[in-house]
């Protein structure tokens, strides 16, 4: 909270959602599930019916997760104009289609209509805030708050400002998303595609190469991920996974021992040069994540979580099989 913000992140009560498609509607569902009042606007003629249908479809999942006190679909209000949507907002989430000209104009309109001191975030997945904030009169309060679909179930939000964004707005947005139950990465600089999408895109491109060359089928690729690294990445991520691959020597041993394999023809992506500086940054970063835990502790944690994920998937699969059997009876 700084003198520039109208309210503290924890005191937010009303969120304006501009754009009510798949991402915008997912945000609406998430904010409602967290107990906020949501005012939504979308220029499409059938926007309200589609939005309420999306929220209704998402609500059982939100109830299973455990909604916040006071959470209700009745807290959604859909209005006819952008000005109405943002008039009393404590925070604005923009989720318009991915067209740069549209984003520039819309963010300028939102900025002009939104009360002073209210942070405005864009859900963009493809543009930098530096590109989008050029038409705004007060660009300092504009940031990116990039979610993953569906926003009401996938917790990650990547927050980053543009060249004209002010630090207080980036920090305020990060704190607000955390208060709203999200897992937040506050990026220190703009990066095309952000972080999660770049990692995801690397795997996706390699999958396309393997299919194109007849090396693997779509089914094999998906099975390789869901029954292999995907299970571990659900809770440790690639860096901590490779740290454990180094045994007691951790990331340092893994890089020193297996570093040359980066030059092996296992991917079409060109590997970075494993310089001493890169090695040291990887080791130091991993040490921060490990935070003093021993390899034995990490292995025990990994195994518990693998078992929990496997059991949860088995339970869901049994329930789905029972539903199919009941439908066929």
UniProtKB/Swiss-Prot annotation:
Enzyme type, top EC level: oxidoreductase
**Location in the cell:** Cytoplasm
Q: Which residues form the signal peptide?
A: none
Q: Major place of localization?
A: cytoplasm
A Pfam family of the record is 3HCDH_N
Q: Which residues bind NAD(+)?
A: 19-24
Please provide, in alphabetical order, the Gene Ontology terms of the cellular component aspect for this entry: cytoplasm
Q: Give the catalysed reaction(s), semicolon-separated.
A: carnitine + NAD(+) = 3-dehydrocarnitine + NADH + H(+)
Alphabetic keyword roster: Cytoplasm, NAD, Oxidoreductase
Query: Might you give the EC number(s) for this enzyme?
Result: 1.1.1.108
**GO BP term, pick one:** catabolic process
- GO MF annotations in UniProt: carnitine 3-dehydrogenase activity; NAD+ binding
Q: Which pathway does this chain act in?
A: Amine and polyamine metabolism; carnitine metabolism
Q: Which family does it belong to?
A: Belongs to the 3-hydroxyacyl-CoA dehydrogenase family. L-carnitine dehydrogenase subfamily.
Quaternary structure annotation from Swiss-Prot or TrEMBL = Homodimer.
The task this protein performs is described as: Catalyzes the NAD(+)-dependent oxidation of L-carnitine to 3-dehydrocarnitine.
Q: What is this protein called?
A: L-carnitine dehydrogenase
């Amino acid at each position: 909270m700084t003198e520039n913000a109208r309210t503290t992140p924890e005191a937010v009560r009303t969120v304006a959602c501009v754009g009510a498609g798949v991402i915008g509607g997912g945000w609406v569902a998430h904010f409602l599930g967290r107990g906020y009042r949501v005012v939504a606007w979308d220029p499409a003629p059938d926007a309200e019916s589609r939005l309420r249908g999306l929220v209704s479809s998402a609500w059982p999942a939100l109830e299973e997760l455990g909604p916040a006190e006071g959470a209700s679909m009745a807290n959604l209000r859909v209005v006819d104009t952008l000005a109405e949507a943002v008039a009393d907002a404590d925070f604005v989430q923009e989720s318009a289609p991915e067209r740069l000209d549209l984003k520039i104009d819309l963010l300028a309109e939102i900025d002009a209509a939104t009360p002073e001191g209210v942070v405005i975030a864009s859900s963009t997945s493809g543009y930098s805030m530096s590109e989008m904030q050029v038409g705004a009169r007060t660009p300092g309060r504009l940031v990116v708050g990039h979610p993953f679909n569906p926003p009401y179930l996938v917790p990650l939000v990547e927050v980053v400002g543009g060249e004209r964004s002010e630090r207080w707005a980036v920090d305020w947005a990060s704190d607000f998303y955390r208060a709203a139950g999200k897992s937040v990465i506050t990026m220190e600089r703009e990066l095309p595609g952000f972080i999660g999408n770049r990692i995801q895109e690397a795997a996706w491109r390699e999958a396309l190469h393997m299919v194109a060359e007849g090396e693997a089928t779509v089914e094999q690729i998906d099975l390789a991920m869901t029954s292999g690294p995907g299970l571990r990445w659900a809770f440790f991520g690639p860096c901590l996974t490779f740290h454990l691959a180094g045994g007691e020597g951790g990331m340092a041993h893994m890089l020193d021992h297996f570093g040359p394999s980066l030059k092996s023809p296992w991917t079409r992506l060109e590997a970075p040069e494993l310089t001493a500086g890169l090695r040291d940054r990887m080791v130091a970063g991993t040490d921060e994540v490990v935070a003093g835990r021993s390899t034995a502790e990490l292995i025990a944690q990994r195994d518990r979580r693998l078992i929990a994920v496997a059991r949860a998937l088995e339970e869901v699969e049994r329930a789905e099989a029972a539903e199919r059997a009941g439908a066929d009876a």
